[in-house]
Amino acid sequence: MILASWNINSVRIRLEIFKNWYEKRKPSIVLLQEIKCESSEFPVDFFLELGLKSYIYGQKGRNGVAILVKESLLDESDKITEVNLTDKLEARVIKFFFKRINTTIYNVYAPNGNPISDSQKFSNKIKWYEKLKDLILPYIYNEKKVIIGGDFNVL
């Protein structure tokens, strides 16, 4: 099984690029970040034609994450959850419980905290990471399988 992650920076304008990439590599699961569209505007049919089911947490014009899974791998008890780590509604984290491998997958699009000289922006980023850590630690403590992928905006 291959899992891939891609900050696609506006999914609707990169469909042909995605198709070429996908047909060459054939990952089972794709984590997309910065899809830059509302969930209702996501090109679900395009991905279905490639055999991929789309799980979307979109936001108009910015942010947004999606998880694409080969339809043949899905189970009725798979579960998707939108996760919000701040008081503001920001589509940055989506959680997928994948029954077939008894694993939770998080797709993350972390906030940018640059420049560091903007202490408030950087401070908000660190607080966001603390909340992400609090979300993930129970999996580790309870020895549950978890995959965390995405764009972490490290710089």
Model-derived regions: residue spans:
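Structured beta-strand-rich core segments of catalytic domains in phosphoester-bond hydrolases
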Residues: 35-38, 42-117
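Active-site-proximal beta-strand elements of phosphoester/diester hydrolases
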Residues: 1-10, 102-115, 149
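Short histidine-centered catalytic/ligand-binding loop motif
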Residues: 116-124
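Amphipathic coiled-coil/heptad-repeat helices and related helical stalk/stem segments
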Residues: 14-15, 89, 132
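Short, flexible loop segments at the rims of nucleotide/cofactor-binding pockets, characterized by
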Residues: 6-11, 82-85, 123-126
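Active-site beta-strand/loop signature of hydrolases that rely on acidic residues for catalysis
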Residues: 6-7, 22-40, 105, 135-155
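Long, well-ordered alpha-helical scaffolding segments within enzyme catalytic domains
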Residues: 124-136
